[in-house]
Every structure is written in C-alpha cells, then in structure tokens.
Amino acid sequence: METRDVIFIDTNVFVKESYFLENNSINKIKELAEDGYVSLLWPEIAFNEVKSHVVRDMLEAFEQVCCKNTRVLRNDEDFQDYCQKGKDVVEGKALKLLENFKSKTNAYIIPNSYCTDVDDVFRKYFDKKKPFGSGKKKDEFPDAFIIQALETYCKKWR
C-alpha cells in the first residue's frame, strides 16, 4: 500500500516565502504534491487567511508602484490609467495564483464544521495553553480553530 505524507502549511510560511515565487519552499511543496509525494490539508480558516494576506500584500505592492509620490511616471496617461484600473487586475491575479496552487496540489479544504469544540478553545485561552500564551493571545484564536479542525479531521479520517 502506497503512503504519502499529509502536510499543513501555516499562513506565516506563505507570507515568509512571498507566496508563490518560482523557486521557494511553497513551490517545492506544490511539486511534491503534483508528483504524489505529499497531500495538503488546508483548514478553511487558514485558506481564507492566506487569501486575505496574498490579496492585501499584492495590493500594497501595487499601491507602492502607483503611489501619488511616484514622480517619474505621474504625468504619463497610460501609467495613470493602469493605476486606476489595475487594482482589480492585481486582486484577480492574487486569487488566480492561490486557486492555481490549491488546484495543482489537490489540497483538501477542511470545512469550518470541523471546528466544533468552542469550549476547548476557550479553556486553552484561559489556561494559556498552546496556541495561546502571554502576549498577543487574542490574535491566536484563528490558529486555535485551525489546530482544532486539523485534529478533528485527523481523528476522524486517519
């Protein structure tokens, strides 16, 4: 019986690797998935986090190019037209890159319905257990539900 490793990639890895660059770790994982060596599990919360981040970061980069302080091209009509219409194009490109990655890796999106034990998440929050701790505790709520979705899915199907 053939086995393959099942992996999850946290949002911060996508951000650190600048998402879908040709020679980064994310692309290597995509190649491993395409070749059948790994399967990707992606909780819906994490997928939506990556979607939000990639769109935000690509739009921020676009806005830096089209910033009002860009003196070199600010009087060029074609450039100004591009800057006015380009946001939708950039957002579409970001979403296309994400969907391409999801499709090529044949990632399984774990539905939010696998996040069923809210009491457990709050217990961990008040007891300062992982993923919570001192500091930015409230920022870890998405991670707590991501972990719960992965644990619930694995207990059910593995």
Regions inferred by a protein language model and the residue ranges of each:
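Active-site-proximal, substrate-binding regions of enzyme catalytic domains
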Residues: 3-157
